[in-house]
Amino acid sequence: MLFSSMVSAETFSIQSAQIIPIGNGHILNAEIKYPLTLRVKEAIENGVPITFSQQFRLIKSIPILGKYWQWNETLWSTEIRYKLHYHALTQQYLLVDLDTRHQRNFSSLSGALKALGRIEKLSLPPKYLTDLDNLILQIRSGIDLNALPTPMRPGALISSKWHLTSPWVAAKWH
């Protein structure tokens, strides 16, 4: 039992994820915890850029044999990627949204990770939300190991200290 709690303490986790109706659409609010291993923290402190991925997928669950067996069809999926790195000269942590290029500065790593883990008012595609029956929105987050600098990649790919991806978690509909 001790081993399983140690393993889960070193992986990312979705603390909460709620889908809220707003106007004619729906938004997602979620909170993700990012406990980093010492190896990942050291890399960040030494200026290595780390790319975080937040993945979302909307699934239509079609019952085949009642609740015992269901066919899942992915209707929509997307990914939001952020790069986090440390600037030694300014002693700031820089968090960049790789889609919009919007960047924010933080004086502490914990502040940057807290901001990274806060998903607020993420719009969901209305074209798939006309019939909410049997719809599941899943979310997970991890580190994109393929975005690491080339010399670091092989070691990171085989080391458990870099594999921190959370399991898929279903958001709650409100």
State what each model feature region is.
Residues 4-6:
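N-terminal signal peptide c-region/cleavage motif recognized by signal peptidases
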Residues 9-50, 59-63:
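N-terminal onset of structured domains
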Residues 19-26, 59-61, 87-90, 127-136:
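A short, structured loop/turn motif at beta-sheet edges
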Residues 28-33, 83-88, 99-100, 104-129:
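A beta-strand/beta-hairpin structural motif
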Residues 40-107:
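Structured domain cores in non-transmembrane regions
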